[in-house]
């Protein structure tokens, strides 16, 4: 008989992350694809990128945002399918309804990820472990799986959710946060990208435990005021509140722009830059469950001035193949041969919201 854990004290924050969500929905609708490498993101012969893939495909090295040609080389036997985003929104809405049934505090991060406040006695009637297990079982009954991490704050919950994927459940009970975090690499904590990780490595800081013990003055000299915040998070001491759906604000636009180290003068180079920026916007739209109806193209020139052009689409979309093609048509209106382009940007707005959307436009992993 298992040992009964002590009563949970303090906040209990969970992070529910649907496992390889787009691929899981495709396999739900096509049972014959289960157990086989599956790639969502168009055609193997296209010049696009992988949106997501099944865990079977990941064993061959395929991952999100990988060029389709490289994915085909790594896994030639994979099944390819275009995304069916209306269907993904439908299943996501069912999952979010389960979360809302368990707690009034649900903060949707993306179409396949949400924070939940399951603090016992405040927003949930039972120990967080029981609530998380019930959520996992209810989601699995829909035909997809999720991984859940629970801890005292968002940082701990997020890291915990990634420890045992897919279909995992990791609980970090109060008082055990530092022991759980100490041996993990600094890259396990969100907000530490490649640049920050490299700077920490130069300081011989490789783990969250080492980060938590670093002198405040040393971190401040490298990262400024963010250094102490990083150290507090590495100690598991972050204070973070889950914001309910009713309190979320709507995103007005999703855009991406780039300033070039050297001015672009050839139309082909400008088109390639716009296409690359558009792929990023498309991924962010899909992660946030947004479809936009207005395309905006922005250029700035070497002599300081700039121009923008907009066009409204007949139907909202999150497909970069559609809105990038429109942006390239708009290029004729604001660029002429001989112009030196210093900056290019592309954006989508006028959203058809698929449920409550959080304003934080973050990349997420499956």
Can you annotate each of these PLM segments?
Residues 1-232, 283, 365:
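Gly/Gly-Pro- and Ser/Thr-rich, intrinsically disordered tail segments characteristic of DNA damage-repair
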Residues 20, 120, 152, 301, ...:
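Non-catalytic surface loops within mature trypsin-like serine protease
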Residues 360-366:
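Residue-level detector of conserved catalytic or cofactor/ligand-binding positions
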Residues 109-113, 151-154, 290-294, 339-343:
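Short Gly/Ser/Thr- and Asp/Glu-enriched loop/turn motifs at secondary-structure junctions
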Residues 2-7, 188, 196, 201-341, ...:
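DNA-contacting surface of Y-family translesion DNA polymerases
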């Amino acid at each position: 008989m298992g040992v009964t854990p002590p009563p949970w004290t303090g906040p209990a924050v969970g992070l529910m992350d649907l496992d390889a969500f787009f691929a899981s929905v495709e396999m739900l609708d096509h049972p014959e694809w289960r157990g086989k490498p599956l790639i969502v993101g168009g055609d193997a012969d296209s010049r696009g990128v992988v949106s997501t893939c099944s865990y079977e495909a990941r064993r061959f090295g395929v991952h999100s945002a990988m060029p389709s040609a490289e994915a085909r080389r790594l896994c030639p036997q994979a099944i390819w399918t275009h995304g069916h985003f209306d269907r993904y929104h439908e299943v996501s809405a069912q999952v979010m309804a389960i979360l809302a049934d368990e707690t009034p505090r649900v903060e949707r991060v993306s179409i396949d990820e949400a924070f939940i406040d399951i603090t016992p006695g405040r927003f949930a009637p039972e120990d967080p472990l029981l609530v998380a297990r019930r959520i996992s079982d209810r989601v699995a009954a829909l035909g997809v799986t999720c991984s859940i991490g629970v801890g005292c704050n968002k940082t701990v919950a997020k890291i915990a959710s990634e420890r045992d994927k897919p279909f995992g459940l990791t609980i970090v009970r109060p008082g055990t946060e530092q022991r759980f975090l100490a041996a993990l690499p600094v890259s396990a904590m969100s907000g530490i990208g490649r640049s920050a990780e490299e700077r920490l490595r130069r300081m011989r800081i490789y783990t969250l435990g080492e980060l938590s013990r670093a002198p405040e003055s040393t971190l401040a000299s490298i990262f400024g005021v963010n250094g102490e915040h990083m150290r507090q998070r590495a100690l598991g001491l972050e204070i973070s509140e889950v914001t309910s759906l009713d309190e979320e604000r709507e995103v007005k636009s999703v855009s991406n722009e780039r300033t070039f180290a050297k001015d672009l003068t050839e139309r082909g180079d400008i088109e390639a830059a716009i296409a690359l920026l558009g792929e990023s916007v498309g991924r962010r739209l899909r992660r946030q469950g947004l479809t936009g109806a207005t395309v905006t193209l922005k250029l700035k020139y070497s002599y300081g001035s700039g121009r923008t052009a907009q066009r409204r689409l007949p139907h909202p979309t999150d497909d970069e193949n559609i809105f990038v093609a429109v942006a390239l048509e708009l290029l004729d209106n604001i660029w002429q041969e001989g112009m030196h382009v210093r900056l290019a940007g592309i954006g989508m707005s006028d959203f058809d919201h698929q449920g409550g959307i959080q304003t934080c436009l973050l990349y997420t992993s499956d």
